[in-house]
Amino acid sequence: MMFAYLPPDLESEILSRVPATFLKELQTTCKRWYALFRDPIFVKKNLGKAATHVIFNNLGDYSVTEMNTLVHSINLRGIQNSFDPSIGVERKLYELNDPEHDKILGIISHCDGLLLCATKDKTRLVVWNPCTGQTRWIQIKNVFKNNPQLILLVIKFKIYEFNSDSWRILDDISPVCFIRSNGVNLKGNAYFVASDKESKFILKFDFTTERFLRLSFPSQNDDQIAVLSVVRQEKLALLQQRFDTSSIKMNIWVTKTKIDADKDLSWSNFLVVDFGKVTLTSEPLSFLVDEENKMVVCSSKIRHIERKTIIYFAKEGIQVHQEIAQKPKGCCSFLVSYVPSLVQF
């Protein structure tokens, strides 16, 4: 009996629409698919068509040695209409199965389906692909030790190269500013909230030219907190929060158009959340924007209570929140817009 085979281009197009979580189970089916799923062109196409998962990084109050490192999934279905505050965190998505998992503190960044994790002793970084289970441990060196006589601090920037498994120092670059928040990655570049003595701005690092560039900031108000996020892997979003005597307001800005490598940023005011006067204030750690439903999901830590984290769901003048279980000291719990991928490293 003869089997009819699809043309390779059509077969690749069909498979590129299958979620990576299912493709990883098919890679041992035949040699042709095994090679296809490792083709960078196919992986990029599959990543571009993948659906986004919202995950919440929090080790919770569980023992890491018993439960491994948990990444929680937040179910947003139904929130647009009912806005039910009982909708919260589902305790299931990925577990980090690594013999040294108990040394990992938590996720600090993410890009193209890969999660960057910090270790408790601050001597290594861990790159983790939750979809494939692949991990890589990267050694880092603390150049500056605790020294009371140290009065001059020289900042150097390094790039880690996966192919050579080595660090490379970037010479002759200095943004000459204060970086105020963790960065986000979008279309191969990194973006940070930064400031100098005169103003605040978005600081972009271009990995192609290996240079910093200053971009426009939406508002120069005296906000105490500013956090960046990414919208659909196309736009940047910025959260600003001020602590007034009468109320706490959260201002959400979104870039008007998709990010273009050669253009400055233009911002629009997306949403203003007024929490009113509250006795227990919180500081946003991360947030995600749903443009279509004009909604924001925000992870915050309660001020003066280090180990308590809450999640806010806010839209059109309505806010609800749900408290999350306590987290270990030093662990930063935040929301991640995660897309499963077959990226290899």
Swiss-Prot record:
Organism phylogeny: Eukaryota, Viridiplantae, Streptophyta, Embryophyta, Tracheophyta
Species of origin: Arabidopsis thaliana
Positions of the F-box domain: 1-46
A Pfam family per the record: F-box
PANTHER family on file: BNACNNG10540D PROTEIN (PTHR31672), F-BOX PROTEIN CPR30-LIKE (PTHR31672:SF13)
Record-linked Gene3D superfamilies: 1.20.1280.50
Official protein name in the record: Putative F-box protein At3g17265
